[in-house]
């Protein structure tokens, strides 16, 4: 399920960048 990993890795809010 790369979609799930992509959603997490592509989440700026999750990374705390925004």
From Swiss-Prot:
GO molecular function: hormone activity
Subcellular location: Secreted
GO term, biological process aspect, one: chemical synaptic transmission
Modified residues annotated as Valine amide in this record: 18
A GO CC annotation given for this chain: extracellular region
Highest taxon of the lineage: Eukaryota
Keywords: Amidation, Hormone, Neuropeptide, Neurotransmitter, Secreted
Stated family: Belongs to the arthropod PDH family.
UniProt function note: Causes the migration of the distal retinal pigment into the proximal end of the pigment chromatophore cells and thus decreases the amount of light entering the retinulas. May also function as a neurotransmitter and/or neuromodulator.
Annotated protein name in UniProt: Pigment-dispersing hormone C
